[in-house]
Amino acid sequence: MTSTTSTVARIALEPRTIDAGGIETSYLEAGAGEPVVMLHGSGPGVSAIANWQNNIGTLAQRFRVLAPDIVGFGATERPDDVTYSLRAWTDHIWAFIDAHGIGKTAIVGNSLGGRIALQMATDCPDRIAKMVLMGAPGVGMTLTEGLAALRAYEPSHDAMRDLLRSYFAVDPAMITDELVAIRYEASIADGAYEAYRAMFLDPRHAGSELGITEDEVRAIATPTLLVHGREDKVVPVQVSVTMLGLLPNADLHVFSACGHWTQIERADEFSALVADYLARR
């Protein structure tokens, strides 16, 4: 039976801040044990809380979970001198991990967060214990209709609702008024829209920068769980199928009747799947 609602009670999550490489970084933290860093995707109004509020409670029962707002997103500082790029985002997450004194960690990355995780595994493979990549861009990624719609967003409550319901979930009922409000308010926070436009002013350039070659992927030996929604309109499931054939230590789980947001559309199953994978020795 397809799960369409989360039965796991949310835990109280109060944002914290830490200096990460000179950037005042907002993040969520819960639990104890081996560290798991959760990286949200891109898009207008994205943040750690909007991305992971249905999952942190389950994972925090077994791990120390940290979920930052990546520079340019959420409540994290937006320095005037930052040029948003894969390198800048990756360096910010390394600084965040270092600021917490963490040597080695697992990474759970959604969409853009998954691409950052791949770069981290390339940079310092000995510091990444495992990866979970959800709807992440990879080899063969092209500019889809969903990505184009994301980058064309102009702030309004109706535009945010229509964007999320049209491209992110198979069942529009999964896009709650609460989620729309969280995303919309974040998209009009001071400097948020300007930062988002700066990231994706030229979608062709942004897309090419996030690309990765087959040889680069084959060189990543980190144990990896690929998770994808079969009906994903933002990053097609075929991207993960291709990555499965290239990553030497990868498994793939595809959720049927599911779009780009596996962690929201199939929250309970996703959280249990990820927790079990990360706990496996």
For each of these PLM feature ranges, what is it?
Residues 23-75:
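Conserved HGGG/HGGXW glycine-rich cap/lid loop of the alpha/beta-hydrolase fold
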Residues 28, 57, 67-108, 272:
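Active-site loop/oxyanion-hole signature of alpha/beta-hydrolase fold enzymes
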Residues 109, 113, 117:
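Gly/Ala-rich beta-loop-alpha elbow adjacent to hydrolase catalytic centers
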Residues 118-122, 129-162:
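Flexible "cap/lid" loop of the alpha/beta hydrolase fold
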Residues 155-218:
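Conserved alpha/beta-hydrolase catalytic His-Asp/Glu region
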Residues 220, 226-228:
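Short beta-strand/loop motif that positions the catalytic acidic residue
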Residues 231-235:
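Acidic catalytic loop of the alpha/beta-hydrolase fold
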Residues 250-281:
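Catalytic active-site module of serine/aspartate enzymes centered on a nucleophile-bearing elbow/loop
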